[in-house]
Amino acid sequence: MASERLPSRPACLLVASGAAEGVSAQSFLHCFTLASAAFNLQVATPGGKTMDFVDVNESNARWVQDFRLKAYASPAKLESIDGARYHALLIPSCPGALVDLASSGSLARILQHFHSESKPICAVGHGVAALCCATSEDRSWVFQGYSVTGPSVYELVRAPGFAHLPLIVEDFVKDAGACFSASEPDAMHVVLDRHLVTGQNASSTVPAVQNLLFLCGSRK
């Protein structure tokens, strides 16, 4: 009966990179599966570009293949998203985030709305770079004074393209007046400060998303 229907689930916006540098397959898999169990999930990328998955391996290749066949695998255009329609924001680890999301005016607008309303935000690994776009007119960062984690310089320097990275999250966060912390390279490390959850790397995806779910549950 209609009167016995479960209440509608809250909406969550999952923002991923559309750049060639791609999206971590393992981080996206965990973000998508955990979040879709609790939310009505909408995936969005800049320009609605198809995601290029990186770090595909034997454990996730089948899932990625199946995901691509689903209708909801086609991302919405980030530029057309109204942040007011969503209760939570989730950004998986995306090496491509440094290329497109970190300078996205559309994402900045959404993040500023989420910040002003204290709505739950979760960013993981390279996805933390996406938060860097959210600067005010006076160039101050909306997350100034927050405690944040993300890829440490020790983790980044191992990658061949380190010298050409457009942004070092650790440096940006410290320069912007926020507090950066990191554990050992590849260690699981999650920071929760007010309504913002950040995970150091792709390995931190599951506990980071679980903290997002906890935040959303505590707001009901």
From Swiss-Prot:
Coiled coil: none annotated. Glycans are attached at N57, N201. The keyword Signal applies. Keywords: Endosome, Glycoprotein, Secreted, Signal. GO terms for molecular function: glyoxalase III activity. It is found in: Secreted; Early endosome. The keyword Heme does not apply. Gene3D superfamilies: 3.40.50.880. One of its GO terms (biological process) is methylglyoxal catabolic process to D-lactate via S-lactoyl-glutathione. Residues 1-35 form the signal peptide. GO terms for cellular component: cytoplasm; early endosome; extracellular region. Belongs to the peptidase C56 family. Homotetramer. Component of the FERRY complex composed of five subunits, TBCK, PPP1R21, FERRY3, CRYZL1 and GATD1 with a ratio of 1:2:1:2:4, respectively. PANTHER family: GLUTAMINE AMIDOTRANSFERASE-LIKE CLASS 1 DOMAIN-CONTAINING PROTEIN 1 (PTHR48094:SF18), PROTEIN/NUCLEIC ACID DEGLYCASE DJ-1-RELATED (PTHR48094). Component of the FERRY complex (Five-subunit Endosomal Rab5 and RNA/ribosome intermediary). The FERRY complex directly interacts with mRNAs and RAB5A, and functions as a RAB5A effector involved in the localization and the distribution of specific mRNAs most likely by mediating their endosomal transport. The complex recruits mRNAs and ribosomes to early endosomes through direct mRNA-interaction. This is Glutamine amidotransferase-like class 1 domain-containing protein 1. It comes from Bos taurus. The lineage of its organism: Eukaryota, Metazoa, Chordata, Craniata, Vertebrata.
